């Protein structure tokens, strides 16, 4: 009898022990959906719907992660629609934005945060901390750049917890400040990274940090699906779940890894760049200094910058993406005043007769007293105003996201005329002269309006139907009765300024970046693949084409002329100077981030170049002494 009792209690003990072990070994189970690319009328809608229904059919998930690119074009309507679909999930979900949600955002990246309620998250489940943030690039075509606000947030997080980081992009050279990101992630205690962007499954490692990139929910002529992640105390598995009609299948894990703390093994130079940094480094500045290039001053803003300058006499004005307009001294860069507004600012301000004009994502066009920063007048649009204004003959010409191009009185903001039939939103600075107003939109179209009454003169449309191929980011230039524009189909188009007729196309010479010489005789354009081309504006022949040595580059920033120099900006914080015959003279690095529109002028002290980069760096160069 005692033997029976002993056997019984041993059995009970083993049973309870096994239950305890099982409880400890029960993993977190997470559904990860990424790259949804919601677009009304496309197959993406049914793909998302099927994935959401399937997630809801699973009985044992802990929560859902959404990895960005939830929309195809970042419109307000797309964001609202996909939010409605995701809200039908029966599990809690946490979301980050992707480049498609940010780059083509008609709201200036405001709507995503307003609709979903946050731009980053931080929560803990079963001993694991999950953090996620947006990746950029905000509004400008470039590699990803975690915004300064996101970097400040990462820097504020305390370490000491096992952490999983969720971001749309791989944290490699796809992200301009990748080395700052991974350094912070290691400090925090990150052990695993989850992302998307590539639309397919990949095992990754970022300076010792393990991670995965996962498939898109899109069927892509195959089957929709998503990812199941299981996370134990020190181990992770990643599996694809594919939806075959009414028969979903979760495949065996394609990724399995033990997770542990990762120490930083990277070495950094005095400028904070890692030893493996693959692009132009700051040592080019030493070479340029020997050729008479001097950095007069340089400082770091506490926010990103995604627009250019207005400058007059001894002052310059610029805006940050956090919504602050600043006035600084050109002598030493010291701040004279700053004012903060109700939305992000991507508009390059314009100065005229003591008035500073710019657009804001809060939907207003503002005119300030340039000396003091006080508001003289403001005019409301029904959506964000991301475009840059031009002033001519006491009138302000500016596009917006609400389908209306406006001409306003500089003095009081009263409406002179409106053109209310614009398709797509406007982000560019228009070309304006006494004959026409020319601007592009994110609906494949380029418009020419009469500057006196706003009547339509002509519309040109890109032959490629995707709205990604729009003449919208380029700042058009004009010479010899011709309009020159660059389109993301990698072509430079030359149009008759009077009729809009296409006169010539230069293939594979550019993406969105053009410029023009001071005398108007030469048009410059920059390709994605390290070439700079000079075109005779009258004869439409190529004068020269040179290798730039800058590698892959997708910056939309206009090429500038500084005296007899051609200044080519890049998306990696560098400028490269050429003479007017195409000879490379020198280069300068300001930061790792995209160079914004530049301002140049000559004085008795020499030629000057005012530059900012997207990470908030602002600097003034003097090129020679006279």
Segments (PLM) and residue ranges:
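N-terminal active-site segment of His-dependent metallophosphoesterases
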Residues: 20-81, 159
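Active-site environment of divalent metal-dependent phosphoester hydrolases
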Residues: 39-42, 72-78, 99-107, 138-141, ...
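His/acidic metal-ligating clusters that form di-metal
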Residues: 56-63, 131, 141-210
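Binuclear metal-dependent phosphoesterase catalytic core
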Residues: 202, 209-276
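Extracytoplasmic beta-rich repeat domains
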Residues: 288-310, 337-352, 375-392, 401, ...
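Short loop/turn segments that connect beta-strands within beta-propeller blades
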Residues: 329-333, 369-372, 409-413, 450-454, ...
């Amino acid at each position: 009898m005692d033997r029976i009792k002993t056997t019984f209690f041993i059995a009970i003990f083993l049973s309870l022990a096994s239950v305890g072990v099982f409880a400890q070994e029960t993993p977190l189970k997470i559904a990860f959906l990424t790259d949804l690319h919601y677009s009304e009328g496309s197959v993406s809608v049914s793909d998302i719907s099927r994935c959401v229904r399937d997630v809801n059919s699973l009985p044992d998930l802990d929560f859902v992660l959404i990895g960005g690119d939830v929309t195809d074009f970042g419109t307000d309507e797309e964001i609202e629609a996909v939010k409605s679909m995701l809200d039908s999930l029966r599990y809690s979900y946490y979301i980050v934005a992707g480049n498609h949600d940010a780059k083509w955002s008609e709201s200036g990246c405001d709507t995503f945060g307003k609709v979903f309620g946050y731009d980053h998250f931080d929560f803990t489940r079963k001993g694991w901390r999950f953090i996620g943030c947006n990746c950029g690039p905000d509004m400008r075509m470039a590699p990803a750049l975690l915004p300064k606000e996101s970097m400040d947030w990462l820097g504020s997080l305390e370490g000491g917890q096992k952490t999983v980081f969720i971001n749309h992009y791989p944290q490699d050279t796809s992200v301009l400040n990748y080395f700052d990101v991974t350094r912070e992630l290691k400090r925090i205690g990150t052990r695993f990274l989850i992302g998307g962007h590539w639309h397919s499954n990949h095992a990754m490692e970022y300076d010792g940090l393990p991670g995965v990139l996962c498939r898109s929910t899109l069927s892509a002529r195959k089957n929709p699906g998503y990812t199941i992640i299981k996370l134990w105390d020190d181990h992770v598995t990643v599996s694809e779940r594919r939806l075959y009609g009414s028969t979903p299948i979760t495949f065996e894990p394609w990724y399995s890894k033990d997770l542990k703390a990762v120490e930083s093994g990277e070495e950094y130079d005095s400028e904070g760049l890692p030893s493996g940094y693959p692009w132009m480094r700051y040592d080019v500045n030493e070479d340029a200094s020997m050729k008479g290039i001097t950095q007069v001053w340089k400082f770091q803003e506490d926010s990103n910058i995604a627009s250019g300058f207005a400058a007059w006499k001894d002052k310059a004005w610029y805006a940050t993406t956090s919504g602050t307009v600043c006035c600084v001294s050109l002598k030493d860069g010291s701040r004279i005043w700053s004012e903060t507004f109700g939305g992000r600012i991507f508009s390059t301000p314009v100065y005229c007769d003591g008035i500073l004009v710019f657009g804001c994502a809060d939907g207003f066009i503002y005119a300030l007293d340039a000396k003091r920063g006080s508001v003289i007048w403001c005019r409301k649009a029904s959506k964000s105003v991301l475009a840059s204004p031009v002033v001519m003959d006491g009138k302000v010409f500016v596009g917006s996201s609400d389908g209306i191009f406006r001409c306003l009185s500089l003095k009081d903001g009263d409406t002179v005329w409106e053109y209310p039939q614009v398709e797509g939103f406007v982000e560019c600075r228009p070309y304006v002269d006494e004959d026409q107003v020319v601007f592009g939109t994110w609906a494949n179209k380029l418009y020419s309006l009469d500057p006196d009454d706003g009547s339509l003169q002509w519309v040109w449309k890109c032959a490629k139907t995707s709205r990604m191929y729009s003449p919208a980011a380029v700042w058009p230039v004009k010479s010899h009765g011709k309009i020159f524009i660059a389109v993301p189909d990698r072509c430079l188009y030359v149009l008759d300024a009077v009729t809009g007729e296409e006169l010539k196309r230069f293939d594979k010479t550019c993406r969105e970046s053009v410029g023009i010489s001071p005398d108007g005789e030469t048009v410059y354009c920059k390709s994605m693949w390290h070439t700079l081309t000079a075109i005779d504006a009258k004869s439409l022949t190529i004068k020269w084409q040179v290798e730039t040595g800058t590698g892959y580059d997708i910056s939309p920033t206009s090429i500038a002329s500084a005296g007899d120099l051609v200044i080519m900006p890049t998306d990696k914080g560098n400028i490269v100077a050429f003479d007017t015959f195409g000879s490379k003279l020198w280069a300068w690095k300001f930061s790792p981030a995209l160079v914004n529109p530049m301002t140049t002028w000559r004085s008795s002290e020499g030629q000057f170049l005012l530059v900012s980069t997207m990470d908030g760096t602002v600097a003034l160069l003097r090129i020679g002494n006279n």
